[in-house]
Amino acid sequence: MENFYNISPDYNTFMNIVITGASKGFGRAIAEIYAAHGHHLFICSRNEIALYKTVEELLTRYPDTKIKAKARDLSRKEEVADFAEWLLANAYHIDVLVNNAGRFIPGSILNEADGALEEMLHTNLYSAYQLTRLLLPSMIKRKSGHIFNMCSIASLNAYPNGGAYSISKFALYGFSKNLREELKPYQIKVTSVLPGAAYTDSWSGSNIDPKRIMEAGDIAAMVYTASQLSPQACVEDIILRPQLGDL
């Protein structure tokens, strides 16, 4: 795992990195790799205790990095607006935005709870859509920035019991692809990240062999590397699957 952070030198020094859903899973892994390279982090999670524990642990490991955090539930439009206002007041500019806030609730379309689709859309789609819209004017003004939208293999392939979750991830991928086309004239990059199964806290207590699926750090390494390319290069899609294929 130590070699995970030994990636080529940064093209940009001390970038401002915004990561939602940063207290665990992919968001935590992405926060860690940027912290390891000394970038400035602005992170968010709905769980205040887990969020500030993440800040404490990252600062202990990487004392030279700067981290600011704000606990907000981005499934709520008013809290998205509050988080965006805080970001614009605290970050001189935003170099990388990682829209990672999300939630997974399994269930078939027929049998899932009433309101499941609305909940998945608010968390997995609207949070990214609304936050991006609020931050884009400052990015467009600078003609610079990179937006990562954390989609899923479920954005590409339907599967039994995917239900509202898969629908929301298909929608997020559509948002990301449209955003990519709209922002080309402004030199703002957009990357859709579509990972398969990776071992995170959501798998703890399950019978899955961690070696059967990916590590969260694999996804973080790809995101970080994509953000380090020359200004004239944009990775549009990052698709990662376990070596043995999907579960």
Describe each PLM feature range:
Residues 108-109, 116-121:
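Substrate-binding pocket helix/loop in short-chain dehydrogenase/reductase
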Residues 152:
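Residue(s) in the substrate-gating loop at a strand-loop-helix junction
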Residues 37-53:
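Conserved glycine-rich Rossmann-like NAD(P)H-binding loop of the short-chain dehydrogenase/reductase
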Residues 132, 168:
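Active-site helix of classical SDR
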Residues 185-188, 192, 208-247:
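C-terminal helical subdomain
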Residues 23-25:
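Conserved glycine-rich cofactor-binding loop
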Residues 48-49, 71-82, 114:
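The beta1-alpha1 cofactor-binding region of Rossmann-like NAD(H)/NADP(H)-dependent oxidoreductases
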